[in-house]
A protein has these predicted regions:
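Flexible, glycine/small-residue-enriched loop-and-beta-strand segment within the central core
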Residues: 2-17, 26-107
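Detector for the N-terminal beta1/A-loop initiation region of ABC nucleotide-binding domains
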Residues: 20
Length: 107
C-alpha cells in the first residue's frame, strides 16, 4: 500500500488569456490559448495550444490536439488537421535556437 500525502498539488490553469477573437468563433475546451488573434468564423478544437503573437486567418479550422508555436501565421480558409504541430524551426545557426528567443523569426 502507498502512503497518501495530505498535501495538495500545484495546479496551473491557463485556458484562454489575452486572445483577440473575431466574429462567430467556436472553441471547444480544454484549450490553452494566450496572446493570439483568431479571425472571423474560425473553429478551434479541444486539446489545442496556440501561443503568443500567433494569428489564425478567417474561416480557418484547427482540429484537436494541435500545437501552434509563437510567431506563426496561418492564412484564411486553412484546415489544420488533427495533431498538427507548427514550431518556430528556422535554424539559421545550423541548430535549434532553444533558449534564444531573439533569434526566432515569424513563420
Amino acid at each position: 500500500m502507498h502512503n497518501v500525502s495530505s498535501s495538495k498539488p500545484t495546479i496551473n490553469e491557463i485556458g484562454i488569456v489575452d486572445v483577440a477573437f473575431g466574429r462567430d468563433v467556436t472553441v471547444v475546451k480544454p484549450v490553452n490559448m494566450y496572446g493570439c488573434t483568431i479571425g472571423d468564423d474560425c473553429f478551434v478544437g479541444p486539446f489545442v495550444e496556440i501561443q503568443n503573437n500567433t494569428k489564425i486567418g478567417d474561416r480557418s479550422r484547427v482540429q484537436s490536439h494541435c500545437f501552434i508555436c509563437e510567431l506563426v501565421t496561418i492564412g484564411e480558409d486553412c484546415f489544420i488537421g488533427h495533431g498538427v504541430m507548427f514550431i518556430n524551426d528556422s535554424f539559421e545557426m545550423g541548430k535549434p535556437a532553444r533558449g534564444h528567443k531573439e533569434l526566432w523569426v515569424p513563420t
